[in-house]
Amino acid sequence: MVKRIELYQEAAKRMAISPDACMEQIRRCSISSKFGYEGTDPASLAAIVGMDADWGAAAFAELRSTGFIKTDWARFKWYQPSGKELDDKIAELAAIEVAAIIRLSSMDCAPALPSIRALAENLLEEADGGDTIATSLAHNRMMLAIVSATGELRLMEDYVKHASVAVAYAVADRLEAADLEGMKRSANVIVDLIGTTEPRDCAAEAVAMRLHPREPVNA
């Protein structure tokens, strides 16, 4: 239980816009393909934003841990998934989220509901603000709480493996205003139904938020 809680807390803390403006600039540029398919290293990172070697080393480690930099044989490269690769990743996340929602329908998850509702409220606020990255991160924080509420360490480990910060940014790069409105409607349904004995509609909205956010089930 302690390991699961620590895993959740660490993942949720990471799932946020960087407080370092230079780091945030690099995150956004990498996902929007402004760096192309070139390799990267600490020195080149520091050069991009005019920082020193220590900053470059720390930034390189942080970008690797959050999924923005991947290992490609003997070099490091930016995470720039193809459309299919991102579709597959989104489907994996949706499948785990559905499994968690179904599991919670047979549990007493009342202790987790205040936190889930607060995170849903945060998602609504971010969506109202129109920032797709902030909304995508808020979506992931809400879903992290839902998966964690099952109490299943293996499910949580699997989810954290797929739900990287870089994936949240890549998803955000696809989102438009209509998607944010749909996500708000789905989030409201999810918090109303999570933990009830009829999880089908709740699970369907979770899938909608991932696969077709502008078309919620209960539009």
Task: List the model feature ranges, each with a label.
Residues 3, 134-138, 181-182:
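Short acidic alpha-helix initiation/capping motifs at coil-to-helix transition points
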Residues 38, 72, 135-136, 155-159, ...:
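Short, hydrophobic secondary-structure boundary micro-motifs
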Residues 119, 161-165, 205-209:
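Short acidic/histidine-centered micro-motifs embedded in hydrophobic/aromatic stretches
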